Amino acid sequence: MAPPHAVDTKQPAAVTEAVKAAFAGIGAEASFPLLERLFADVTGMFAGRYPGYQAIDMQYHDYEHTLQATVCLTHLLQGRSRSLDRPVLRTRDWELAIMSVLLHDSGFLKKTGDLTGTGAKYTFVH
């Protein structure tokens, strides 16, 4: 995988390809359809194409922030997988980690009819 700063986190397709390259590095090409669907769903979520919900309206917790976190986590997974530490991370561990980072701000989604405030109101502390 390219160094984190070399991945254009303003472009979901660039991050998707970087993550897929990392998965290929551990022989997990079978995860590609899952990753493609996940990135497509999360892109739609942030853009307001998730049925019954608005686009995420947070200034910092935007899609680029999520993509930046995804690139960073992917590098952590790669480093951990090259180490001799145990337990060994399996493909499913990688999948769950990427799902988690991509969805970590989904709690900020507001329902379509909710017109007051931002999604931050759904957190206990923000």
PLM features per residue range, with description:
Residues 12, 31, 81-83, 100, ...:
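Generic serine detector
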Residues 1-56:
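Non-catalytic interface/linker regions that flank or bridge core catalytic/transmembrane domains
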Residues 54-96:
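Alpha-helical phosphate/pyrophosphate-handling elements in metalloenzyme active cores
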Residues 92-126:
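Divalent metal-dependent catalytic cores for phosphoryl transfer on phosphate-bearing substrates
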Residues 44-52, 72-82, 108, 112:
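Short helix-loop boundary/capping segments at the starts of domains
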Residues 39, 70, 98-100:
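Generic structural concept
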Residues 1-6, 71-76, 94, 119-126:
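Hydrophobic transmembrane alpha-helix bundles
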